[in-house]
Swiss-Prot record:
It comes from Bartonella bacilliformis (strain ATCC 35685 / KC583 / Herrer 020/F12,63). It is an enzyme of class 5 (isomerase). The lineage of its organism: Bacteria, Pseudomonadati, Pseudomonadota, Alphaproteobacteria, Hyphomicrobiales. Catalyzes the interconversion of 2-phosphoglycerate and 3-phosphoglycerate. CDD domains: HP_PGM_like (cd07067). Homodimer. Keywords: Gluconeogenesis, Glycolysis, Isomerase. The record marks 158 as: Transition state stabilizer. The active site is at 10 (tele-phosphohistidine intermediate), 88 (proton donor/acceptor). This is 2,3-bisphosphoglycerate-dependent phosphoglycerate mutase. Its EC number is 5.4.2.11. One of its GO terms (molecular function) is phosphoglycerate mutase activity.
Length: 206
């Protein structure tokens, strides 16, 4: 019996190309982002996958990516559960700011610490650990039970919420996880053993 989880970071958003801190702000996908999502769906269909249930965040860039993926897989009516527990990390006072402007205001080193530290949050925002504190319970209580019942599950979310999830799935340290980079619109496929250990991991590049 297959126990499969597919993770996809949303396609490129309008704020990605403007070099802005996005966080819980809600910009739409760019045309490139829509193409990335469509390509992801085609590649997942080509890989022979069919989802039993799908999860996404409360933000439209993730929701629309999920919808494009499911349309390409001929599953447009599949149940898509939306929850803010899967939202991007909240960047607090950095949200909406240009990253270069933020470096000028607070200094390059401080901004780098806020972006890449596991425990240090920007003013009025979340650290990666804070993000994990909402992602992990939601995954274990709501999503993992489907996988353990040998279902195939899709999660479309964000760079940091997925990074936090990958940390627990792969047993990575706080030092290792902050170095992980996730490309937009690129599916990561995990197969699990009955005891929830990873049997295989595959990244589908277009």
């Amino acid at each position: 019996m297959r126990r499969t989880l597919v993770l996809v970071r949303h396609g490129q958003s309008e704020w990605n190309i403007k070099n802005l801190f996005t966080g819980w702000k809600d910009p739409d996908l760019t045309e490139k982002g829509r193409t990335e999502a469509i390509t992801a769906g085609k590649n997942l269909k080509k890989a022979g996958l069919k989802f039993d249930i799908a999860y996404t965040s409360a933000l439209q860039r993730a929701q629309k990516t999920a919808q494009h993926i499911l349309e390409q897989m001929a599953q447009p009516d599949l149940q898509l559960i939306k929850n803010s527990a899967l939202n991007e990390r909240d960047y607090g006072d950095l949200s909406g700011l240009n990253k270069d402007d933020a470096r000028q205001r607070w200094g390059q080193e401080q901004v780098h610490i806020w972006r890449r530290s596991y425990t240090i949050a920007p003013p009025n925002g979340e650290s990666l650990r804070d993000t994990g504190a909402r992602v992990w319970p939601y995954y274990f209580h709501h999503i993992q039970p489907h996988i353990l019942r040998s279902q195939t599950v899709l999660i479309v979310a964000h760079g940091n919420s997925l990074r936090a999830l990958i940390m627990v799935l792969e047993g990575l340290s706080s030092e290792e996880i902050v170095l992980q980079e996730l490309a937009t619109g690129v599916p990561i496929i995990y197969e699990f053993n009955a005891d929830s250990t990873i049997l295989s991991k595959k990244i589908i590049q277009s």
